[in-house]
Amino acid sequence: PEGIKDNDAIFTEQIALAVKSLGALETERGDYVAILGANTLGIIAAELCIYYQLVPIVIDVDETKLSLAENHGIYYTINPSKADVRQRIIEITGGKLAEFTLYEPRSNMLPNYIPSITQEGGTVAVIGYNYFLSNLQLNLGDVLEKQLNVTAVKNGYGEFNTAINLLANKVINTEGFIDSVIKFDDIDRELPRISEDKY
């Protein structure tokens, strides 16, 4: 559509996935949403939280990614190598922990944080669309003990129009998501380098 740059449009699927993921949580204004991973999808989900008047808390071990999240307006970020994640979330939420947690397996964050940061009876959404993930391990005893609701969202089906509308209205800021642009003629030369990069 007119008014949307190509470099923004390539994130339509991730925006649609984030919209669908937050919709699956049945949040209310002011709820806290812990997001495990400050990758592109995690930051987009956090931006949407702010738009929906939720309070995102982004958790990642990569300071560069956390800085990018902060540049996108995310106020609460936690680096587990620098702070006790559970204690910090207790401070942020006034002792009640996060009502909701989003976990994106490609973020390289461990799922074992989920029970310690999500309040009893809270909801966890495992989100993403990478079908080549290794097995994920989460202690179901902890999930049962806290009576957590677990759901999964693997695509943004049904939310593309919403995603396009959010881009057109500049709700989502994609600045910093693209490291470099490669010209078509340079693909053969650049492919070995970019195939080694982790995203």
Residue ranges and their predicted role:
Residues 1-6, 147:
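Glycine/charged-rich beta-loop-alpha catalytic/anionic-binding loops adjacent to active sites
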Residues 5-82:
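Mid-domain Rossmann-like dinucleotide-binding core that forms the NAD(H)/NADP(H) cofactor-binding site
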Residues 26-27, 93, 105, 117-119:
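A generic alpha-to-beta junction signature in SAM-dependent methyltransferases
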Residues 29-32, 98, 121:
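Phosphate-coordination loops involved in phosphoryl transfer and adenosine-cofactor binding
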Residues 83-95:
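Short amphipathic alpha-helix with an adjacent loop that forms part of the alpha/beta core around
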Residues 101-102:
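N-terminal Rossmann-like NAD(P) cofactor-binding module of classical short-chain dehydrogenase/reductase
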Residues 108-169:
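Glycine-rich phosphate-binding loop and adjacent beta-alpha segment
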Residues 112-116, 157-199:
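C-terminal hydrophobic helical "lid"/dimerization subdomain
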